[in-house]
């Protein structure tokens, strides 16, 4: 199944209040497959939240579990494995697409100060190592899971 997806839902684009939740910046909105909406939420959170491989794994599981729970509460009776396939494949494919963006940021001196500020790292080398760790989670760990799910 497909649905309307925001495709850029992460903390800077999500406002919480007593009245509810509001999503900002719908420029990337479009159709998405089951599980796909989680990709930007998890992937971008990894760049802004004290990343470790353990943190990434916990975030991945917590977000996916809450997603399935929300689908169930809304009446969806589908196979959670299919949602996991959509999520892991999307995480891998978008992770590959983002490598070029990471490289462009790292080689552009005009971006370096902002990168240091945003990622709270002292050097471009530290930022590159940080980016590599995030990509390792997405392009090794999650890609392996996607491959395993697709093969079973």
Region spans (language model):
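Active-site acidic catalytic loop and adjacent metal/ATP-binding pocket
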Residues: 1-36
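Active-site activation/catalytic loop segments of kinase-like enzymes and analogous catalytic loops
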Residues: 35-75, 93-112
